[in-house]
Curated annotation (Swiss-Prot):
The chain crosses the membrane at residues 33-57, 70-94, 110-129, 149-172, 197-224, 247-270, 279-303. This is Pinopsin. The modification N6-(retinylidene)lysine is found at residue 290. It holds the Pfam family 7tm_1. Pineal gland. Residues 1-32, 95-109, 173-196, 271-278 are extracellular. InterPro entries: GPCR_opsins, GPCR_Rhodpsn, GPCR_Rhodpsn_7TM, Opsin, Opsin_pineal, Retinal_BS. Residues 58-69, 130-148, 225-246, 304-349 are cytoplasmic. It is found in: Membrane. One of its GO terms (biological process) is phototransduction. Phosphorylated on some or all of the serine and threonine residues present in the C-terminal region. It comes from Columba livia (Rock dove). Residues 1-16 have a biased composition (Polar residues). The keyword Cell division does not apply.
Length: 349
């Protein structure tokens, strides 16, 4: 195909358009594309396995189907869709060195990755809010029921649709980004149309959920510390408090590590059109955010002992490896287990 026919490139250039042919060595060396393909391949396999396990185990074991666990399944579904619609597409494109599926599917990929990514992001915020309401009891003796959980899950999808559909209708757009093997919101063009959308997206889909997470977990930690202070200051209690603190810090840091580089890059590029950023460097925040689909279920689900028990029973065909026969011996609950399950819910507190 004649590269001068591509609408993405000015005439008289030897660089193919992002949908026309390999972008190496014009954007980056071929080795860079293959390295990203390897990373995306690892993410696709790992995220598909861990999120698939979360969904299957939650469906199979009734005791995991509590209202407070709905949001964890919602998060796993969103992460699985990001993997299927984003990471797998990026894997194929990086092997070929360009966006092989064409402009229309570029827009669809950008939309689907943004939609499901923001659903996952807001799922983390709703989970934090649920933990705050259940543990800190600002509403008194309020119990989450199925309708509350369904409402929370529905909100994440409706809110995300509200802010990811406009680029399909003319308010900004979805375009190839970085190495030009994945698509996302148009941070690059500038102008009031794009800048107003980027600013709105930043506030509604990053600042707001981050504020909710920080508020909820800060109050949760203070409540748990106050409860621990009323108990005997034994080594076990202190260990439980330290473990919960580390878990909360891990949750917040995982959120920031995933989304802060991406949003920072977007704002810098959107507000400084003259800045020159290497394509490989510009791609890092986007690809790095996709790795959250692997560690989200590990932090929020696999660290919960009740889920671990159900997972082991399923993988071992009903036989618990830590016990004899088909059931595991009951172990007394420790303060560590109790406080940890307040942060990563397996059942209402």
């Amino acid at each position: 195909m004649d590269p001068t026919n591509s609408p993405q490139e000015p005439p008289h250039t030897s660089t193919p358009g992002p949908f026309d042919g390999p972008q190496w060595p014009h954007q980056a060396p071929r080795g860079m594309y293959l390295s990203v393909a390897v990373l995306m391949g690892i993410v696709v396999i790992s995220a598909s396995v861990v999120n698939g396990l979360v969904i299957v185990v939650s469906i199979r074991y009734k005791k995991l189907r509590s209202p407070l666990n709905y949001i964890l399944v919602n998060l796993a579904m969103a992460d699985l869709l990001v993997t299927l619609c984003g990471s797998s597409v990026s894997f194929s494109n990086n092997i070929n060195g360009f966006f092989v599926f064409g402009k229309r599917l570029c827009e669809l990929e950008g939309f689907m990755v943004s939609l499901t990514g923001i659903v996952g992001l807001w799922s983390l915020a709703i989970l934090a809010l649920e933990r705050y309401v259940v543990v800190c009891r600002p509403l008194g003796d309020f119990r989450f029921q199925h309708r509350h959980a369904v409402t929370g899950c529905a909100f994440t999808w409706v809110w995300s649709l509200l802010w990811t559909t406009p680029p399909l209708l003319g308010w900004s757009s979805y375009v190839p980004e970085g190495l030009r093997t994945s698509c996302g919101p148009n941070w690059y063009t500038g102008g009031s149309n794009n800048n107003s959308y980027i600013l709105t997206l930043f506030v509604t889909c990053f600042v707001m959920p981050l504020s909710l997470i920080l508020f909820s977990y800060a109050n949760l930690l203070m409540t748990l510390r106050a409860a621990a202070a009323q108990q005997q200051e034994s080594d076990t209690t202190q260990q439980a408090e330290r473990q919960v603190t580390r878990m909360v810090v891990a949750m917040v840091m995982a959120f920031l590590i995933c989304w802060l580089p991406y949003t920072t890059f977007a704002l810098v590029v959107a507000t400084n059109k003259d800045i020159a950023i290497q394509p490989a460097l510009a791609s890092l925040p986007s690809y790095f955010s996709k790795t959250a689909t692997v560690y989200n279920p590990i932090i929020y689900v696999f660290m919960n002992k009740q889920f671990q028990s159900c997972l082991l029973k399923m993988l071992c065909c009903g036989h618990h490896p830590r016990g004899t026969g088909r059931t595991a011996p009951a172990a007394p609950a420790s303060p560590t287990d109790g406080l940890r399950n307040k942060v990563t819910p397996s059942h209402p507190v």
